[in-house]
Swiss-Prot record:
<dbReference type="InterPro" id="IPR036554">
    <property type="entry name" value="GHMP_kinase_C_sf"/>
</dbReference>
<dbReference type="GO" id="GO:0019288">
    <property type="term" value="P:isopentenyl diphosphate biosynthetic process, methylerythritol 4-phosphate pathway"/>
</dbReference>
<comment type="function">
    <text>Catalyzes the phosphorylation of the position 2 hydroxy group of 4-diphosphocytidyl-2C-methyl-D-erythritol.</text>
</comment>
<dbReference type="GO" id="GO:0005524">
    <property type="term" value="F:ATP binding"/>
</dbReference>
<dbReference type="InterPro" id="IPR004424">
    <property type="entry name" value="IspE"/>
</dbReference>
<keyword id="KW-0418">Kinase</keyword>
<feature type="active site">
    <location>
        <position position="137"/>
    </location>
</feature>
<dbReference type="Pfam" id="PF00288">
    <property type="entry name" value="GHMP_kinases_N"/>
</dbReference>
<dbReference type="GO" id="GO:0050515">
    <property type="term" value="F:4-(cytidine 5'-diphospho)-2-C-methyl-D-erythritol kinase activity"/>
</dbReference>
<protein>
    <recommendedName>
        <fullName>4-diphosphocytidyl-2-C-methyl-D-erythritol kinase</fullName>
        <ecNumber>2.7.1.148</ecNumber>
    </recommendedName>
</protein>
<keyword id="KW-0808">Transferase</keyword>
<keyword id="KW-0547">Nucleotide-binding</keyword>
<keyword id="KW-0414">Isoprene biosynthesis</keyword>
<dbReference type="InterPro" id="IPR014721">
    <property type="entry name" value="Ribsml_uS5_D2-typ_fold_subgr"/>
</dbReference>
<feature type="binding site">
    <location>
        <begin position="95"/>
        <end position="105"/>
    </location>
    <ligand>
        <name>ATP</name>
    </ligand>
</feature>
<comment type="pathway">
    <text>Isoprenoid biosynthesis; isopentenyl diphosphate biosynthesis via DXP pathway; isopentenyl diphosphate from 1-deoxy-D-xylulose 5-phosphate: step 3/6.</text>
</comment>
<dbReference type="GO" id="GO:0016114">
    <property type="term" value="P:terpenoid biosynthetic process"/>
</dbReference>
Amino acid sequence: MKAYAKANIFLKLTGFDSRKYHLLESRFILLKDLFDELELVDKESDSKKEFEIISNFKCENNIIQKAYLLLSKRYNNELKELFSKKSLKLTKNIPVCAGLGGGSSDCASFLLLMNETLNLKLNLQELINLSIQLGSDIAFFLSGFHSANVSGCGEIIEEFEDDIPNLKWTFPQISCQTKAVYDEFDRGIFDFQKNNNQAQIYKKLSTKELLQNFKNKELNDLFTPCATLYPKMKSYLQEDFFLSGSGSSVFKVDR
């Protein structure tokens, strides 16, 4: 099963919820040519792990493990039987700490794979309700939409009929820590009402129109704090690249 990456075309922070989590307005688009892959494979006879992930990256305490534990509260017997014979193979192609949602997409694909394999018969809303307990971007990947306006803490998804130009990507070898970038944003000067007003304009425009008519700092509230925390990102800010999420992946329209 393919777990596709995503890009944020705009990302505006508009307040906090009751848990002090950031509220956002954003355009998410699915990147169909960049994906991780998940599959069930026969378990090695000497493996003693109840749930084993075989991967080309470090998997301890990752979001798929958390999804397994959450599902096991309701489907413990089914999961134990499956993973007594199978392991989960995860092939990572999406850069990590890059603003592309790789972990969230992997988690969504794991939930979908379990729903299909174990015939759990969970509908989309039930899957989204589970995903909210795990992470903020997962709902978009569950939706299957190619483009959507996303709000709340990432759980409110509205499909958008979009015009998406070809994008040229650059993946700096910089691991941007999401929490650190958000914390740096909080230390700055911001106007949530202004951000929300801008977002209401942006969400009506196509991705092509957004990238043609607005500056990178206007579209993504996290670009300035990202460049402050990670000085090597400043050159991309100055050279009119657009930032996805909290970084470090950047892109331009491929003309």
